[in-house]
Amino acid sequence: MKECVVWTVNLDSKKSRAEGRRIPRRFAVPNVKLHELVEACKELGLKFRAEEKKYPKSWWEEGGRVVVEKRGTKTKLMIELARKIAEIREQKREQKKDKKKKKK
């Protein structure tokens, strides 16, 4: 089983390529958190393990990584994860709107 490491920084649209972003900005999402990356892996049915590690290039920032069973190319996997994170965020936004409407 081949594995690949995906850092939260790799999917962050606020980071430049030099700072660690690995996918095109149009696919990336801002301020990715480890728990979001874990949730995306679960929803995509990937075998993974999460690690609370610091990205070496920005060791002072919060972050983490997941070691994922490789499926296709690493770039395609990261784009798939970023899209799933964006989808999860949208679902949470809609749930918050629904809760506010119910309170009124």
Curated annotation (Swiss-Prot):
Q: Does the keyword RNA-binding apply?
A: yes
Q: Does the keyword RNA-binding apply?
A: yes
- Give the record's keywords alphabetically: Cytoplasm, Ribonucleoprotein, RNA-binding, Signal recognition particle
Localisation:
Cytoplasm
| SUPFAM superfamilies reported for this sequence | SRP19 (SSF69695)
Q: Which GO terms describe its cellular component?
A: signal recognition particle
Name the GO terms of the biological process aspect: SRP-dependent cotranslational protein targeting to membrane, signal sequence recognition
Q: Which domain of life is it from?
A: Archaea
Q: What Pfam families does the record tag this protein with?
A: SRP19
The GO terms describing molecular function are: 7S RNA binding
Q: Which family does it belong to?
A: Belongs to the SRP19 family.
Q: How does it assemble?
A: Part of the signal recognition particle protein translocation system, which is composed of SRP and FtsY. Archaeal SRP consists of a 7S RNA molecule of 300 nucleotides and two protein subunits: SRP54 and SRP19.
Describe the task this protein carries out.
Answer: Involved in targeting and insertion of nascent membrane proteins into the cytoplasmic membrane. Binds directly to 7S RNA and mediates binding of the 54 kDa subunit of the SRP.
PANTHER family, sorted: SIGNAL RECOGNITION PARTICLE 19 KD PROTEIN, SIGNAL RECOGNITION PARTICLE 19 KDA PROTEIN
Q: What is this protein called?
A: Signal recognition particle 19 kDa protein
The organism named in the record is: Archaeoglobus fulgidus (strain ATCC 49558 / DSM 4304 / JCM 9628 / NBRC 100126 / VC-16)
Q: What is the lineage of its organism?
A: Archaea, Methanobacteriati, Methanobacteriota, Archaeoglobi, Archaeoglobales
Its encoding gene is what?
srp19
